[in-house]
């Protein structure tokens, strides 16, 4: 079995479990799935796990600060000013290796906005982002494990055909 099939199986099973349990876990399944995809986009593996979680956490914090700061400033276009400042910061933080996955920060801020951009959704969004990344990591490990457990097949063709 190749990796594409084994990852399809593991993601399918884990995503089905996630969606079934999301409400009782107080997580947003769509945010988990976005973060899950970000894990693979970051290059996967342990480094991808670290970079995705770090960038996701900063992104959701930045999203919260953008909305909060715009409310404090209270002038027309305050939201645009806050977005400009924090979009710059999301890119600038990439100079630090652990925060170098820029799409993670942007998608996580967008997830906060998409979930309603209210203080009461912050924990659910942050938890969902972390859970989605961990599910990406687990699905990757399980897919590779399935590939290793597959028994090699013996070809019917003999390598010595001169007999």
Task: Give the positions of each predicted feature.
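Canonical alpha-helical transmembrane segments
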Residues: 37-52, 64-68
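Pore- and pathway-forming membrane helices of multi-pass small-molecule/ion transporters and channels
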Residues: 26-43, 84-119
């Amino acid at each position: 079995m190749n990796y594409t099939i084994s990852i399809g199986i593991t993601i399918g099973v884990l995503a089905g479990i996630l969606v079934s349990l999301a409400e009782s876990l107080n997580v947003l399944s769509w945010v988990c799935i976005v973060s899950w995809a970000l894990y693979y986009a970051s290059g996967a593996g342990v480094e991808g796990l670290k970079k995705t979680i770090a960038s996701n956490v900063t992104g959701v914090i930045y999203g919260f600060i953008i909305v909060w700061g715009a409310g404090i400033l209270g002038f027309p276009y305050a939201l645009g000013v806050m977005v400009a400042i924090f979009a710059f910061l999301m890119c600038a933080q990439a100079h630090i290796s652990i925060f170098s996955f820029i799409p993670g920060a942007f998608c996580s801020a967008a997830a906060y906005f998409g979930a309603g951009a209210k203080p009461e959704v912050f924990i659910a969004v942050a938890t969902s982002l972390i859970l989605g990344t961990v599910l990406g990591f687990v699905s990757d490990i399980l897919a590779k494990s399935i590939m290793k457990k597959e028994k090699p097949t013996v070809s019917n063709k003999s390598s010595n055909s001169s007999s």
